[in-house]
UniProtKB/Swiss-Prot annotation:
Catalyzes the formation of the alpha-1,6-glucosidic linkages in glycogen by scission of a 1,4-alpha-linked oligosaccharide from growing alpha-1,4-glucan chains and the subsequent attachment of the oligosaccharide to the alpha-1,6 position. InterPro entries: A-amylase/branching_C, Branching_enzy, GlgB, GlgB_N, GlgB_N_E_set_prok, Glyco_hydro_13_cat_dom, Glyco_hydro_13_N, Glyco_hydro_b. Keywords: Carbohydrate metabolism, Glycogen biosynthesis, Glycogen metabolism, Glycosyltransferase, Transferase. It comes from Shewanella baltica (strain OS155 / ATCC BAA-1091). One of its GO terms (molecular function) is hydrolase activity, hydrolyzing O-glycosyl compounds. The keyword Cytoplasm does not apply. Monomer. This is 1,4-alpha-glucan branching enzyme GlgB. Pfam families: Alpha-amylase, Alpha-amylase_C, CBM_48, GlgB_N.
Length: 743
């Protein structure tokens, strides 16, 4: 019998298949024409099977019983008089059960030539729809289509719960021209764990997580997970329409940066993360109440190490398991939109970690990264750098950006560590980097990728915001790509942040000698579309909280912090503030625990929180604070040279008919009475905000809510007034009817 059965296989093919060395598996397994088209033959490999019958799917009838070729599980047989291929299943008898298995080797390739072309070209925006694990239906049969890019692998198999992690069971179809491997598996269930088992050219075997997996196991496990079929039903049409019609560079934008794992926790010891439903019920109402327009989430792509805060993602397409599943995340974003809150995602495209189950040497070669460590390794973070010159890598990243914006309705991306992408010598000594083709230090491939990314995303997703964390003086970060810029919508103003926080930490007595640290930013404020950012990076790793940075007793600390926020909200540029800063968190941020919400039992912390809330609401109510953020006409110093008193006075202007606002910021504890300031209009003024008010925890020094202009020219204005300037305080003054008109 064995001799007869072996005739079903080519010479040595059965041995090669059993040893996992037969790569053109579709030419062997499945249904094939035999005997010069006069018969059909079916071959299959099913370990531990006792017998196998071929059943027609159309009528459920048994067509043939296959011969057992050997004890390892090879079966084969001809199908009587049938000569035309048909859909079939294999009825398999095992020692303890009987299973009906739809043979995956009877199906043709499900890949589309256009998709393949765009992927290789570097312009695919939906590569996740054919790469990874996607539910598909072909010839009326439902299953999961697995596909992975591994051009230099000798063999690739899908292994998982559905085949007992047997690497010889489901060898994939190889496409030599483009390096893709695919297999359609009908007998897979939602939630099944899987990986790709790769044989390298040197014979080594390595099991890798799916680079395009949309769900992954939690550490220390790292299997990919077949996604559910159900999808979220969106209810944010009104928001998406409004977003598309909004010019954000002219609109108020106040972002609340959140690390979901430590904003707030639950459990007796605070050991449990809030899930997305908790966040819908707690975070969204809080952000709305505080008046922020946006939430910016620190990275939520799957990452194994909590201490990386998400900045070393291994599953770039998989929302982290920590807070729920993908549909839970979509429900959270949907709820944000229904509450009128935008949501920005922190996106990591500058580097990836070396975890062995991830992208590193994925198919035995440097596929996603550069081979040369002078271009492929980040010395600071011991991570790897994407090869931005490779079309498939660009498609991987471009599709990922589109994935978060299209499938999850995020309102934009904040790109981490853009500076490290732009320069080949970033954090490297001479001799540790390679110049570009022109001998320069600019990473031309990364620059091109960023330009294409921004151009494509702004075109595909109207109303989004693309934000760069870029800490150098690279020109044109927010300049349009058709003018040789990078095409971002906004750039974090790291210069303003460093200067202002340095100033904040100085004793008030000596601030007069560092006055320029708060005025210099206006020298370059209109060179880019800036976002003023006080992010997580400024309150961690020994830097201390904002409150901790400020010298003096508690009264001075809280008063100074309120005045600083007043200056920040009055300064041109969009705003970003890290969670906890809005109520004066005392300890520096710890990702392993909740913020210190108990501090809100104390009035000084309540005062800072109330001050931020009122600043945000004024910011949204008064167009002067946003509509000309990036136009010189929107800002005018009244006095930027009063270093002796450390007082800063300026005016913010809107368009014609918008009420102007005057800011007076005093950064010393000295009270000033009879202090004259210029005013842009005649008439009565009111104190819209006074950070020294008792309701904010101040000493209640001010102007009793009103200021009257007189026709005495001062500071370049035709009108002026004598006012009281509170100690370590911020005043916001405007025409008495301005707020009512704005509302």
């Amino acid at each position: 019998m064995m001799t007869q059965a072996n005739a079903y296989f080519y010479d040595g093919a059965d041995v090669a298949l059993l040893n996992g060395q037969y790569t053109d598996v579709f030419s062997l397994l499945g249904m094939h024409s035999a005997n010069e088209g006069k018969a059909l033959i079916v071959r299959c490999f099913l370990r531990n099977a006792i017998s196998v019958d071929v059943i027609s799917i159309k009528d459920g009838r048994k067509v043939a019983s296959l011969d057992k070729v050997n004890e390892q599980g090879l079966f084969a047989g001809t199908l009587g008089r049938r000569v035309k291929p048909f859909l079939y299943l294999l009825r398999v008898e095992y020692p303890l059960c009987q299973l009906d298995i739809v043979d995956p080797y009877q199906f043709d390739s499900l890949l589309n030539s256009d998709d393949i072309y765009l992927f290789g070209e570097g312009s695919a925006e939906r590569a996740y729809e054919f790469l990874g694990a996607n539910w598909r239906q072909t010839q009326g049969v439902e299953g999961v289509h697995f596909c992975v890019w591994a051009p230099n692998a000798k063999r690739v198999s899908v292994v998982g719960d559905f085949n007992h992690w047997d690497d010889t069971r489901h060898v994939m179809r190889q496409h030599l021209a483009n390096g893709l491997w695919e297999l359609f598996l009908p007998n897979v269930v939602e939630g099944a764990h899987y990986k790709f088992d790769l044989v390298y050219q040197n014979g080594e075997r390595h099991t890798k997580s799916d680079p395009m997996a949309t769900q992954m196991e939690c550490a220390p496990h790292n299997a990919s997970i077949v996604p559910p079929k159900a999808h979220h039903s969106w209810n944010d049409t009104a928001w998406m329409s409004k977003r598309a019609a909004t010019a954000w560079h002219k609109a108020p934008m106040s972002a609340y940066e959140v690390h979901l794992g430590s904003w707030r926790r639950k459990g007796e010891q605070g050991e449990q993360y809030l899930d997305y439903q908790d966040l819908i019920e707690q975070l969204i109402p809080y952000v709305k109440e505080q008046g922020f327009t946006h939430i910016e989430l620190m990275p939520i792509s799957e990452f194994p190490f909590d201490g990386s805060w998400g900045y070393q993602p291994v599953g770039l397409y998989a929302p982290t398991h920590r807070f729920g599943d993908a549909n839970g995340l979509k429900a959270f974003v949907d709820a944000c939109h229904q509450a009128g809150i935008g949501i920005i995602l922190d996106w990591v495209s500058a580097h990836f970690p070396k975890d062995p189950h991830g992208l590193v040497r994925f198919d035995g070669t440097c596929l996603y990264e550069h081979e040369d460590p002078r271009k492929g390794t980040h010395p600071d973070w011991d991570t790897l750098i994407y090869n931005y010159d490779r079309g498939e890598v660009r498609s991987f990243l471009l599709s990922n950006a589109c994935y978060w914006l299209r499938e999850f309705h995020f309102d934009g991306l904040r790109l981490d560590a853009v500076s490290s992408m732009l320069y080949l010598d970033y954090s490297r000594e001479p001799g540790q980097w390679l110049p570009n083709a022109y001998g320069g230090r600019e990473n031309l491939e990364a620059i091109s990728f960023l330009q294409i990314l921004n151009q494509r995303l702004y075109q595909a997703f109207p109303g989004i915001c693309m934000i760069a964390e870029e800490s150098t003086a690279f020109a044109g970060v927010t300049k349009p790509t058709d003018q040789q810029g990078l095409g971002f919508g906004f750039k974090w103003n790291m210069g303003w942040m460093n200067d202002s926080l340095s100033y904040l930490g100085r004793d008030p007595l000596y601030r007069q000698f560092h006055h320029h640290q708060l005025t210099f930013s206006l020298m370059y404020a209109y060179t880019e579309q800036f976002m003023l950012s006080v992010s997580h990076d400024e309150v961690v790793h020994g830097k201390g909280s904002l409150l901790h940075k400020i010298p003096g007793d508690d009264w001075q600390k809280f008063a100074t912090l309120r005045a600083y926020y007043g200056f920040m909200w009055g300064h041109p540029g969009k705003k970003l503030l890290f969670m906890g800063c809005e109520f004066g968190q005392r300890n520096e941020w710890n990702h392993n625990q909740s913020l210190d919400w108990h501090l809100l039992a104390y009035e000084p912390h309540q005062g800072v929180q109330r001050w931020l809330k009122d600043l945000n609401h004024l910011y949204q109510a008064m167009p002067a604070l946003s509509v000309q953020d990036y136009e010189g006409a929107g800002f005018s110093w009244l006095d930027c040279e009063n270093s002796r008193d450390s007082i800063f006075t300026f005016v913010r202007y809107g368009l014609a008919g918008d009420a102007p606002l005057v800011f007076v910021i005093n950064m010393t504890p000295q009270l000033h009475t009879g202090f004259r300031i210029g005013l842009p209009l005649a008439g009565d003024y009111r104190e819209y905000l006074n950070s020294d008010s008792q309701i904010y925890g101040g000493s209640n020094q001010g102007n009793a809510g009103t200021v009257v202009a007189e026709s005495l020219p001062w500071q370049g204005m035709a009108q002026s007034a004598l006012i009281t300037v509170p100690p370590l305080g911020c005043l916001v003054i405007g025409p008495a009817t301005g707020l009512a008109e704005a509302n």
